[in-house]
Amino acid sequence: LVDLFTKDSFNTVEDYSNLDWPETTWNFACSTTETSTWADGGRKFGELMEKATGGKVKVNIYAADQLTNGNQSEGIQALMNGDPVQISMHSNLIYSAFDPRFNVVSLPFVYDSYDDADAKFDGEAGEKLKEILGEYGLHCMGIAENGFREITNSKHEIKSVDDMKNLKVRVAGSNLLMECYKRWGADATNMNWSETY
């Protein structure tokens, strides 16, 4: 079923209904909003899963980590526990709270382009991250990037590190990013993604 959600089979799916699936419902959680591509991906996964199992497996979508009151770290812990979350899409930044090795994905200035990042995570780096998730009893179906860490604000354009001085910014729950922004002179605050919109 890992191939169920790949680019090649995005709109078609093989029939696995002969595998005697128990009737069950899985909960899919993501930290982004209901209208995000992450939630859309969860809905598409649910559609394909239901089709592949002859309707025996249904998938409920819980955006903004609704099952854990918006707490992203608790969302991952719920996935590790298998209850109430069975499938999730979360950022490496949140996983870094459990294991600092996930910070490698967010190191500044490591990737030359989106193609470079994709090549790394489609290769050895991605396989290593999947191994680390396996250490926590999790199975990674795929790795996706969500863009580089662009800095957006309502005060002024940022062209150099000097423009960061005393700028109040929201930073995802990563000690690495908090330290980077502080060293760049920003007034960084940790905030869950679900609290930003």
Regions found by a protein language model. Name each.
Residues T25, K56-N60, K168:
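Residues at or immediately flanking beta-strands
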